[in-house]
Amino acid sequence: MLLAGSCDWLEVSPSNEVNEEDLFAKGSGYRNALNGIYLNMSDNSLYGRNLSYGFIEVLGHQYLPEHLKNTGSYYKTYQFLYDDTDVKSFISVMWSKGYNVIASCNNLIHNISEADAMLFDGVEMEKNMIWGEALALRALMHFELLRMFAPSMEVDDGKAYIPYVDEYPVINTTYYTNAEILKKIEADFKEARRLVAMCDVEQHPEWMQYDVRMRGDGVTTDLPDDVFYAFRGYRMNYYAITAWMARMYMWAKDYDAAFSCSEEVINSTYKDRAYFDFINSAELSKDKKDSKSLIFTISHNNVLTDEYKPFTNNGSGRGTSGADFVCAWKR
């Protein structure tokens, strides 16, 4: 369990501010707002590094400590030195960035809930898609913060550890118990799944095929006319939400519900062809990207040049954070 404190983490202050009335006057503004949320989530302080292969994996001791010595703050994280200034900075930034993402979701949800469906090129389907994804991202971010900043359900003491923020602007910040937070997360996920189902399940299940959802290509008749509807694998699609629900239920120790959600994802098909090809370890060695089994991913275009390329140019595996992560990974 991590601790953090801040007073400005519920503000939305983009560097390229656009008047809110202008932004939400057109359907394209809602698209831009949603894309901005995904972009913020790809920041290195969140899924661009620390919530994927960085801080979280170091805490889980997925790296060899002798190689982490070159990373400084990550080596301190490995040793659980939570009072160290650098480690405190990691924790504080994850807290503030996480709730800033939530604030952006709430702003979008607040506006789209009252928007006329005719503003959108895809009318009701597009409105529901954007609305549902924003709800799902709000739930996802709260769940991640709950896992980091509250005790697990194994040792839950019934105390309130984090706020669940579902309004914009924020009037009051109320902290809730694990059980209360999980109930709110579940409600958001369920409503989000209902909303995105119009596109992903009812009207255009073909867009969830691998070639369309991950590559943006495929059989001509399967391709959406508008690229906004393509690449559903990089967005909170119906099956991504269902998979996150399975993860949430596992954490909550509701194993029957977790199994049900997992089974739905695993058995999902289009014209008797599985959406996701979950490969074994031998096949994984042939396909390092393993993109056919990806249910949801966040795009971070610079990760190759920022992390892997410096390592390839430095055979010693020293001097860059990317190199140290590659060398330290426990194979």
Locations of regions flagged by a protein language model:
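Membrane-proximal, proline-rich intrinsically disordered regions
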Residues: 7-59, 262
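Conserved, well-structured interaction surfaces
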Residues: 31, 72-149, 171-180, 195-196
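Flexible helix-coil transition and linker loops at the boundaries of alpha-helical arrays
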Residues: 115-125, 195-216, 224-232
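Short coil/turn linking the two alpha-helices of tandem helical-hairpin repeats
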Residues: 146-153, 200, 251-253
